[in-house]
Regions:
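Glycan-recognition patch characteristic of GH18 chitinases/ENGases
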Residues: 29-136, 223-229
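Glycan-binding loop/region signatures in secreted carbohydrate-active enzymes
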Residues: 65, 246-317, 338-348
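Sec-exported extracytoplasmic/periplasmic mature domains
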Residues: 71-74, 98-99, 133-141, 169-174, ...
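Bacterial Sec-dependent N-terminal signal peptides
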Residues: 1, 5, 16-42
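Substrate-binding surface in catalytic domains of secreted glycosidases
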Residues: 46, 78-88, 130, 150-280
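Short, well-ordered coil/turn segments that N-cap beta-strands
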Residues: 41-43, 67, 100-104, 140-142, ...
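Conserved, mostly hydrophobic/aromatic
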Residues: 69, 106, 146, 208, ...
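Active-site and adjacent substrate-binding regions of carbohydrate-active enzymes
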Residues: 137, 147-174, 178-180, 306-348
């Protein structure tokens, strides 16, 4: 073999060795971060469960009727951190929801001032979101619900709310893992609160729990706080006027009644309490008594016929219903949640 050929073979071996070393030393590329919502849940039946209720007083069937349970609340503190109300109740509700195949969310609330201060800076939002996501992972939740009541256009919180929701959405939607929802007003009244909800948010939030109730008056009598007309107004404003995707519209239904033309202090009653005072499940008003008023008064609520109509409206013009709150309902044939589920064909 000639010396030239030997040199060529030697060079070939060196080349192969170097090439092999390079392949072994290459660091695989980092997978791209995917920001995308989790799979859609279809028609939502959302029920809030406040921290001050006893989980044992609400039967399992009420959790089977809902496919999402919002625990109320995780609070933003004056220092901008997260504080979850009543951890023992929280963990009991988590267990009860999961045992009955319902998703469990943490609903975030607090004073407007505390939200405003926390959301005012990048650092404040980043710190709060980090605590929220740590709680979501620690308690193995399925998502979060934002219940800031309410950002406004006249103090700059419309912009900081939008920034907060964008950043929280990105954290929840990282690798399509967690849901994010938000509570908004019925949309009836133009102004600094309604207008603070920017259309941009439709891209960040998986659905909106529209609070189509509490349209009361302390001076005008005979005014229903949550009639069917208000539900229609909510649908028309959010989905038609504003262009919210109907797949993201969830209609709120109250399981309680309010008077009109008198004080709301100690006069608001649960649906169950109204029926206990001989109110009818087939009516939307009743004469009741309560400690906040010296004489019997008229209270306005949603009976089963109205709830059925609202459920059908939500099915045709939206994508879900929400109830505040589970404990207010009865747990028998007169149940409002049962009437809604039976109307939309939800099995439980």
């Amino acid at each position: 073999m000639s010396r030239t050929v030997q040199k060529l073979i030697s060079l070939l071996w060196v080349s192969l060795i170097v090439s092999g070393c390079k392949k072994n030393d290459v660091t695989p590329p980092t997978p791209p971060v995917v920001i995308s919502p989790p799979p859609d849940l279809g028609f939502k039946v959302v029920g809030y469960f406040p921290y001050y209720r006893d989980p044992a007083t609400v039967p399992d069937v009420k959790f089977r009727m809902t496919n999402v349970v919002n625990y109320a609340f995780g609070i933003v503190t004056p220092s901008g951190s997260l504080s979850i109300n009543s951890i023992p109740v929280f963990t009991a509700i988590i267990a009860k929801a999961k045992a009955n195949n319902a998703k469990i969310f943490l609903s975030l609330s607090g004073s407007h001032t505390d939200f405003k201060n926390m959301a005012a800076t990048d650092a404040g939002r980043r710190s709060f979101i980090k605590e929220v996501m740590n709680a979501v992972r620690s308690y193995q939740l399925h998502g979060v619900d934002m219940d800031w009541e309410f950002p406004r256009t006249d103090d700059g919180t419309d912009a900081t709310y939008t920034a907060l929701m964008k950043e929280l959405s990105d954290s929840c939607h990282r690798d399509a893992k967690y849901y994010i929802t938000a509570a908004v007003t019925a949309g009836k009244y133009a102004g600094v609160i309604r207008d603070a909800i920017k259309n941009e948010l439709f891209n960040y939030v998986d659905w909106f729990n529209v609070m189509s109730y509490d349209d009361f008056s302390t001076t005008t009598p005979y005014r229903h706080h949550s009639d069917y007309t208000l539900a229609q107004v909510s649908v028309n404003y959010w989905t038609t006027t504003r262009g919210m995707p109907k797949t993201k519209f969830v209609l709120g239904i109250p399981a309680y009644g309010r008077p009109s033309g008198i004080t709301q202090t100690n006069t608001v009653l649960s649906y169950a309490a109204i029926l206990a005072q001989s109110g009818s499940s087939q009516s939307d008003s009743a004469i009741v008594t309560a400690g906040g008023h010296p004489s019997p008064y008229m209270i306005y609520y949603n009976g089963q016929p109205t709830v059925k109509k609202k459920a059908m409206l939500a099915k045709t013009a939206g994508n879900g219903i929400m109830m505040w709150e589970k404990w207010h309902d009865t747990h028998d044939a007169a149940s409002l949640l049962k009437a809604a589920c039976d109307t939309i064909g939800r099995t439980y």
